């Protein structure tokens, strides 16, 4: 799916590098994406690529890891 958040759809934006002499060249601002395991409401666990804003806001439910006794 490329560099795009699977929850909010955030993707790269275009901007400029600006030098001291004010010469502008194109650059890309990439979102901070992380691959995390997400537990779906059905109980299934799936790996998704999400931005850190969605992680912090609680939009992704991490699966419960059980310790073996």
Curated annotation (Swiss-Prot):
InterPro entries (alphabetical): Bacterial_rp_bL28, Ribosomal_bL28, Ribosomal_bL28/bL31-like_sf, Ribosomal_bL28_bact-type, Ribosomal_bL28_sf
A biological-process GO annotation: translation
A GO molecular function held by the record: structural constituent of ribosome
Superkingdom classification of source: Bacteria
Protein keywords: Ribonucleoprotein, Ribosomal protein
Entry GO terms, CC: ribonucleoprotein complex; ribosome
Family statement drawn from the similarity comment of this UniProt entry: Belongs to the bacterial ribosomal protein bL28 family.
NCBIfam families: L28
Protein name: Large ribosomal subunit protein bL28
């Amino acid at each position: 799916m490329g560099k795009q958040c699977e929850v909010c759809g955030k993707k790269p934006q275009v901007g400029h590098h600006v030098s001291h002499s004010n010469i502008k060249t194109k650059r890309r601002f990439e979102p901070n994406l992380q691959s995390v395991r997400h537990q779906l409401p059905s109980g299934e666990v799936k790996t998704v690529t999400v931005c850190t804003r969605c992680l912090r806001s609680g939009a992704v439910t991490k699966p419960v890891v059980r310790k073996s006794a």
